[in-house]
Each structure stands twice: as structure tokens, then as C-alpha cells.
UniProtKB/Swiss-Prot annotation:
One Pfam family this sequence matches: ArAE_1
Domain of life: Bacteria
Protein name (database record): UPF0421 protein SERP1427
Transmembrane segments: 26-46, 61-81, 109-129, 132-152
Organism the protein comes from: Staphylococcus epidermidis (strain ATCC 35984 / DSM 28319 / BCRC 17069 / CCUG 31568 / BM 3577 / RP62A)
Location of this chain's protein in the cell: Cell membrane
Length: 328
């Protein structure tokens, strides 16, 4: 816990941005270069992972060169007092960066382009190469800071988001089963809750992608094992949500009649799943599962019970996912 105390006050990425700004400005001043352009580059170069910083840095450098080049060209043609110099520099920088697929560097390139115009005067070549050098300093400094200092660790966030996802999806399954038992086959409420659940699941995927990228640079066998465990957990959650969506998004005018035994089975299963978070374990409902399996066997998949058969299959698959997860 001692190495995480700063998270309660300031984020690691904020700290690294401050350090990158400090070192970038220091290096520029030592070389007697204007630091503002290097600082702009350094600030936007701090990404969630070192890999992202390096990958985007390869595109930000040429984009900055393009911006500086247009600033010099249009200042030479129209002068630094003409609005055309600013407008054309920005416009052509955006245009060329887009054409060359350098969109990640467009913002810095445009800012560099318009900001350097007032200071060019007659020193066109010097200003062009000095901006190129300062941009390189900003990129390299920020990349090294992001790589060396406080390497990102997303395990804690992943654990939190996975736990939140599981709590919500178990509760949503319980609520949806209650709706089905009450004959409410179309529900705006559960549809909205499912959308929120999918947003959390997407955030989990993003965090896992960040951590996977980071482990390519800071390799650790224990961390790889931990990430694999979290990945498997997230995969099972995705399967659960996929089957859950199939019992929420039903065709219009769906109408299903459950008999007394099927209703009791659904109540027992939904209560058991809803109680997982509170109890910390999964209480198997073998008798209820046997009831649903028996019901499916008696149905013809292609008669009027087709929708009911499909619905029960989805519930059985959800149960199987949890049965495997909590297997001893």
C-alpha cells in the first residue's frame, strides 16, 4: 500500500506530465532553445502506456515537421502580420496530416504552426530546424519519463471494474427473471441497465489492452499470470452478458407461459445468482436446473414453444458459466 499513497492525492499520469514538462523545459533552456513548442509536444505525448507514447510519437514528429514547414513557407510569402499566414498554415497542416494518416499529431502540429509564426521574422531556416529539434526533445523526454517513472499498473482498476460488472450483471439477471415471471417480456429499464453494463465491460477491455501493452516493456512472469487470470474472468463475464442480452432483447409480441415448476426453478436460480456477491459463493440449484432441462426436452424446437425453448437454453448456459467459475 505504501507505493500507492500518492493515488489518493494525485494520479501517476499527472505526476509524469509534470516531470516531462520540467525536464523538457530544462533541456531546451540548457540548449538556449524556446521551450514552449517542446513542452506542448511533451504534454500530449504522455499516454496511458509507454507503447502508446512511442507509437504515437512516431506520427507526432513528422506532423510537427509539416506544421513548422507550412508556418515558414506562408510567413515567407505573406509575412507574419497577415491573417492568411495563420489560416493557411493551420488549414494545410490539417489537410496534409489527414492525408498522410497523421491525425494523432494534428493538434500539436497546428499549435506549433500558428504559434511559431510571430517569432520567425527573417530566420526561416533556423526557426524550422529549431522547432524540429524542440519537438524531438519533447517526444524523447516524455517517452523516457513514461517508460521509466511509475510504469502504469491497471490491476487494481481491473479488479474494481470486474467486481462492479459482476455485481451488476448478477442483479440484472435476477431482475430480468422477475420480469419474465410477471409476463413483462419487453423492458426499457433492463435494456438501459444492460447498456450501462456493456460500458463497464468495454472499460475493462480497454484497461486490459493498456496493461497487456505495458507488460511487453516491463515483463514480469507473476504479472502475466495475474493478467491472464483477470482476462479469463473478463471473458466469462462477457459470455454471461452475451447470454443475458439474449433474454433481455426478445422479439416484439413475445409471450411465454411458464408452469408452476418452471417458475419455482427460475426463482431459485435467480435468487442463487443474485446472492453470489453477498455470500461470496454460488449455491447450486441442481433440482431447478433438472426441471428446466426436462422442460426443454419436452419441447419441439420449431413449434410454438420455440421462443421459450431458446430462453431456457440461455438461462441454462448462464448457470453453466457460473457453475464452471465457482467449481471446487
Amino acid at each position: 500500500m505504501n507505493d500507492k499513497w500518492y493515488r489518493h492525492i494525485i494520479g501517476a499520469r499527472t505526476i509524469k506530465t509534470g516531470l516531462a514538462t520540467f525536464f523538457t523545459s530544462l533541456f531546451c533552456m540548457l540548449l538556449n532553445l524556446t521551450p514552449i513548442f517542446a513542452i506542448l509536444t511533451a504534454i500530449v505525448t504522455i499516454e496511458p502506456t509507454a507503447k502508446a507514447s512511442l507509437k504515437k510519437g512516431y506520427k507526432r514528429l513528422p506532423a510537427t515537421v509539416i506544421g513548422a514547414l507550412f508556418a515558414v513557407v506562408f510567413t515567407y510569402v505573406f509575412g507574419d502580420q497577415s491573417p492568411l499566414s495563420y489560416a493557411l498554415s493551420a488549414t494545410f497542416t490539417i489537410l496534409i496530416c489527414t492525408k498522410l494518416n497523421l491525425q494523432v499529431g494534428t493538434t500539436v502540429a497546428v499549435l506549433t504552426s500558428v504559434a511559431m509564426i510571430p517569432g520567425i521574422h527573417e530566420a526561416y531556416v533556423f526557426n524550422f530546424f529549431s522547432r524540429l529539434l524542440t519537438a524531438l526533445i519533447g517526444l524523447v523526454t516524455a517517452g523516457l519519463v513514461n517508460f521509466i517513472i511509475l510504469p502504469p499498473k491497471y490491476y487494481h482498476q481491473l479488479e474494481e471494474q470486474l467486481a462492479l460488472s459482476e455485481k451488476k450483471m448478477y442483479r440484472l439477471f435476477y431482475e430480468r427473471c422477475n420480469e419474465l415471471l410477471l409476463g413483462k417480456f419487453s423492458s426499457e429499464k433492463t435494456s438501459k441497465e444492460l447498456s450501462k453494463l456493456n460500458i463497464i465491460a468495454q472499460k475493462v477491455e480497454t484497461l486490459m489492452s493498456y496493461q497487456r501493452d505495458e507488460l511487453h516493456y516491463h515483463k514480469n512472469e507473476d504479472n502475466w499470470k495475474l493478467l491472464n487470470r483477470l482476462t479469463n474472468r473478463a471473458y466469462n463475464n462477457r459470455l454471461f452478458i452475451s447470454h443475458l442480452s439474449n433474454i433481455i432483447y426478445l422479439p416484439k409480441h413475445t409471450s411465454i407461459a411458464f408452469d408452476a415448476n418452471e417458475k419455482i426453478a427460475l426463482i431459485n436460480i435467480s435468487n442463487s445468482i443474485n446472492g453470489i456477491i453477498q455470500k461470496g459463493s454460488f449455491a447450486r440449484q441442481k433440482k431447478s436446473i433438472a426441471t428446466l432441462k426436462s422442460s426443454v426436452k419436452q419441447m419441439d424446437e420449431f413449434d410454438q414453444n420455440q421462443m421459450k425453448s431458446t430462453l431456457i437454453y440461455e438461462i441454462l448456459l448462464i448457470y453453466k458459466i457460473l457453475d464452471s467459475r465457482y467449481a471446487k
